[in-house]
Structure formats: structure tokens, C-alpha cells
Regions:
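Mid-to-C-terminal alpha-helical segments outside catalytic/metal-binding sites
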Residues: 3-6, 19, 23-54, 202, ...
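A generic "structured core" feature
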Residues: 5-6, 10-13, 48, 129, ...
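Active-site neighborhood of phospho(di)ester-bond hydrolases with catalytic His/Asp-centered motifs
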Residues: 5-8, 58, 85-86, 111, ...
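Conserved, mostly hydrophobic/aromatic
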Residues: 9, 47, 71, 102, ...
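Histidine-centered divalent metal-coordination motifs
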Residues: 9-15, 148, 173
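Short, acidic/polar
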Residues: 36-46, 92-102, 186-187
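Active-site gating/metal-coordination segments in enzymes
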Residues: 53, 62-152, 158-159, 201-208
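Catalytic pocket-lining loop regions of alpha/beta-barrel enzymes
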Residues: 124-237
Length: 284
């Protein structure tokens, strides 16, 4: 196993709602951010316990919406250990200006939240032409874009991957594929169809590890297939802590167990090297 581990999907929630007021997307705070919040300091302690050296902290969209202030302050406080993945309204005319604002504050990725948690239906704006200036700005700034979405939005991802080939697109939870049918995983055909787009990356989170054990699926048949289609250099681990239940050491252990079927070289990409590709600042 790699001696260094990088997490590209933890979240943080401040205990100071006055300094960092709630502004959740859709107007409804997620249950996890209310019942098991983790502050910056608690994340640092959890990472130390788990042996996770660095992280790309993802904006808690269902708590703070597009106000990335707490995230920016966290990255500023630990600039050698963290980068941040911010959120803006990409359909708004001033989106590129907001993106520049957060980039200057040390945030090197952007998140688009279109499905999940408090949003039960897949949004239809992912490939809206009004978002093109924001995507062009991401290309200019070298920002990776991670997408919280369902597999229903894969056709939209294809259109954006083709239109903006220089933007690294990361699919949270591997776009939530259905794996219970088992090999050859025909129900996940739309996911595998994305392999031909070299700018599309997959984030391996607790959700996909659980899905890989559902029905006829097994980690030993699914993850080698994923590597054979995409290559390990386009796969990266994200804990989804604390949104996913369990301690950070437990979530990392689940990931390691699930990926034990892969060669060491592949796991080195998934736990370290791909993260450095997506967020080069974490390689410093």
C-alpha cells in the first residue's frame, strides 16, 4: 500500500453559525451536516488518526450552498495540507468572476451539485449553454470540476466533456451506477461508455464500495473491470466523511479492503497519484 494517502472528498461544518451562516442549496440542510458535523479541527485530527496526509475538501453544498467562506478559511489555515473544491452558480452571469474570487483564495476545484441528499431529482441544467462561460473559465484556470449527479446525467457529461476537453471532470460516487446485476455489469454500460473520454475521472467513495457488494456484484469483479476500462490513473479515492457514516479510519479501511484485489501500482494511483493530477497543489 502507498505510504501517502490523499482524500479528495471530505467535508467540514463549522460550529459557528453566526460567522458561517447556513445557506443550503434548495433551502433544506442535509441530515448528515446537522446530526454528525465535523469541524476543520476535527477533520485534521481524524486525518492524523487515519494516516491521511492531504485532502481536497469539498464544499458542503447542502449546508452552505455557494458561500465557500469556511472552506476558504480552512485552506488558508492549512495551505500545505489542503486545497478546496468550491461551489458557484454556474448559470449566473457573474459566475466567472466568482470563480476567480475563490481561486485567488486557494481553492483549486469546483463542484456542481445536481443530484443527491436534499435533491431527489436529477437537475437538467448540467449542459445548459448559460454555464459555458463558467466551464470556459475552469478550463482557463485549470480547475477540475466534480459533479454530484446520477447516471441519468451521463449524456450531458458526454456533451460537456466533448465541448471542454481540457477540463478534468470528476464524477462523484462514479455517477451512482447500478451494479447488482453483476458481471458483465450491463446496467452500468453508460458509465463504461465514458472511458473513451480521457478528461473524465471517477471518484471512488463509500457508496460505490457498498454498491460493489450488492446482489451479484463483488469488488473482485467490478474494480478490475473499472481499471481495465478507465485506467487507475483516472480513479481516485474520496472518503465522503462525515456524510458517509463511520470514522475516517473505518472509511479508509473499507476502501482498502475493497481495492485489495488490485495491484499495488493501481492502488498507488487511486490513493495518491490521481489526486495529484486533479489537484496539483497537493503534490507540493
Amino acid at each position: 500500500m502507498p505510504t501517502t494517502t490523499i482524500d479528495i472528498h471530505p467535508h467540514i461544518i463549522s460550529g459557528d453559525a453566526t460567522r458561517y451562516p447556513l445557506a443550503p442549496l434548495g433551502g433544506h440542510q442535509s441530515d448528515w451536516s446537522r446530526t454528525r458535523p465535523v469541524t476543520l479541527e476535527q477533520l485534521v485530527a481524524a486525518m492524523d488518526t487515519a494516516g491521511v496526509q492531504k485532502a481536497a475538501i469539498v464544499q458542503a453544498s447542502t449546508c452552505y450552498g455557494h458561500d465557500n467562506s469556511y472552506l476558504a478559511d480552512a485552506v488558508s489555515a492549512y495551505s500545505k495540507r489542503f486545497t478546496g473544491v468550491f461551489s458557484v452558480d454556474v448559470l449566473a452571469p457573474g459566475a466567472p468572476e466568482r470563480m476567480h474570487h475563490w481561486r485567488v483564495k486557494g481553492l483549486t476545484g469546483m463542484r456542481l451539485f445536481t443530484f443527491g441528499s436534499t435533491m431527489s431529482e436529477q437537475a437538467d441544467w448540467l449542459d445548459d449553454p448559460k454555464s459555458y462561460p463558467a466551464w470556459a473559465c475552469a478550463s482557463e484556470l485549470g480547475l477540475s470540476i466534480c459533479l454530484q449527479m446520477s447516471a441519468k446525467a451521463i449524456p450531458q457529461v458526454i456533451r460537456m466533456a466533448e465541448r471542454f476537453p481540457k477540463v478534468r471532470i470528476i464524477l462523484d460516487h462514479c455517477a451512482r451506477p447500478e451494479l447488482a446485476d453483476g458481471p458483465p455489469y450491463s446496467a452500468a454500460a453508460s458509465l463504461f461508455a465514458l472511458a473513451r473520454y480521457s478528461n473524465v475521472y471517477l471518484k471512488l467513495t463509500p457508496r460505490i464500495f457498498a454498491e460493489s457488494r450488492r446482489g451479484k456484484a463483488t469488488p473482485e469483479t467490478f474494480f478490475p473491470r473499472l481499471v481495465s476500462e478507465f485506467g487507475a490513473s483516472r480513479l481516485a479515492w474520496g472518503s465522503n466523511y462525515p456524510s458517509s457514516e463511520g470514522s475516517l479510519p473505518q472509511l479508509l479501511d473499507i476502501a482498502r479492503q475493497s481495492l485489495a484485489c488490485l495491484p499495488n501500482a493501481d492502488r498507488d494511483w487511486i490513493f495518491v497519484k490521481t489526486a495529484r493530477t486533479l489537484y496539483p497543489v497537493l503534490a507540493d
